[in-house]
Amino acid sequence: MNEYIESCHREKHTYDEEGVREAVRLFLKSIGEDPEREGLVETPDRIARACRELFTGLQASPADALEKHFDVDTDELVLVKDIELYSVCEHHLLPFHGVAHVGYIPAKDGVMGLSKLARLVEVYARRPQVQERLTQQIADALVEYAGARGVIVVTECEHLCMSMRGIKKSSARTVTSAVRGMLRNPATRAEAMSLILDK
């Protein structure tokens, strides 16, 4: 687990709404706009409220998202596909969006409710992020907090920092994966990937 992930687990980040408003006003002035004109006068408030929602993952705990288990003993793969995700690229503060496919072999003490996997994706997506780390964090949390014996996470996303600026390739999608534990076995991994790719 890298230093960033550890720090997020240790600390509860606070949200400074007034600080965000002031930063937006300064940003608008810095790009040559008038933050007091009619169309922009309420923009700092709107962005401050939006960012509170977009970055709720900074205050959320992956352990809380995964806390409840059901007493079902299975060593078979559980897979939830096409979990919608929206995040913000930490390099340009532009959105990226797509889907996560999350599969795991449960711990011996039970399975999680299926909604827990979607909640876990939200915990890590709702923060300044890069897709590669997002994918790894989801996988690592399932091992660390749910005791999963095997994990596979695949994310497929479109990045607006590639679509709107720079190379401007709007149809490009980025795919990242993370595999842990029993799912590193080639046969088990192949089975999981076939289920993920089966549309």
Swiss-Prot record:
Statement: the UniProt record of this protein carries the keyword Nucleotide-binding: yes
HAMAP family assigned: FolE (MF_00223)
Biological process annotations from GO: one-carbon metabolic process; tetrahydrobiopterin biosynthetic process; tetrahydrofolate biosynthetic process
Protein name (Swiss-Prot/TrEMBL): GTP cyclohydrolase 1
Catalytic activity: GTP + H2O = 7,8-dihydroneopterin 3'-triphosphate + formate + H(+)
EC number: 3.5.4.16
Pathway: Cofactor biosynthesis; 7,8-dihydroneopterin triphosphate biosynthesis; 7,8-dihydroneopterin triphosphate from GTP: step 1/1
GO cellular component, one term: cytoplasm
Gene (name only): folE
Protein residues bound to Zn(2+): C89, H92, C161
Keyword Lipid biosynthesis: no
InterPro entries: GTP-CH-I_C/QueF, GTP-CH-I_N, GTP_CycHdrlase_I, GTP_CycHdrlase_I_CS, GTP_CycHdrlase_I_dom
